[in-house]
Amino acid sequence: MPDLMPGNRFRKRVAASIVGKHGEFLRALGGNADLHRWLKANQPFPYFPQRFELYENIDATILHNEPIDYLEFGVFQGDSILKWASINSHRDSRFIGFDSFEGLPAAPDGITGYGPEGAFSTKGAVPATSDPRVRFITGWFNKTLRPFLRDFEPRSRLVIHNDSDLYSSTLYMLSTVDPILSAGSILIFDEFANPLHEWKAFRDYSYAFDHTYRMLGAAGYYYTQVALEMIK
């Protein structure tokens, strides 16, 4: 039925224009609201000013320095993976970092992105370490992760640390490692508060795979870093 009211047509055009120009901003606002509701529903949980304090608390109160299989996605200069290797000193722990070391694979949006293509590049240089428990796998996740998993057998509790920043990278990683996750596996997100990237990827993955979690703690401004333990 035709719209005989010019005022209605004008309002529709204005609304379409606003959504078209500011759709990403509106989606970010909606994502922030979803994140806020989720965090509120999962309280109480311990909060720490710095992420390394969160890591230390997890190892001391949950892992008790028992051996772990630690997989990190998005290594950059190695601060997190090397910190975890220093915190968890068990000789049987394994620490494996995945990164292209070429920076971000694509330029994300200007509202919730992190920089242009190539941001966080180390120009191919991997972090230096003398710890034999630590190794790095160089390349894009969609080229390296499946071949790695074909031969990988978890020996200890899994700790998955994600600092890949982008929605696509985070969702690909979570979906791909899902077969090796189980109750007790720990997931850590370094940029969880980003509503259109790590948070959205985690939410979509959890809905699709029907997983539930308990909060182990958070750190940083507005829960930038979050740690969870898988229940099912």
Residue spans for each PLM region:
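S-adenosylmethionine/decaboxylated-SAM
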Residues: 35-42, 60-232
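Class I SAM-dependent methyltransferase Rossmann-like catalytic core
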Residues: 2-82, 86
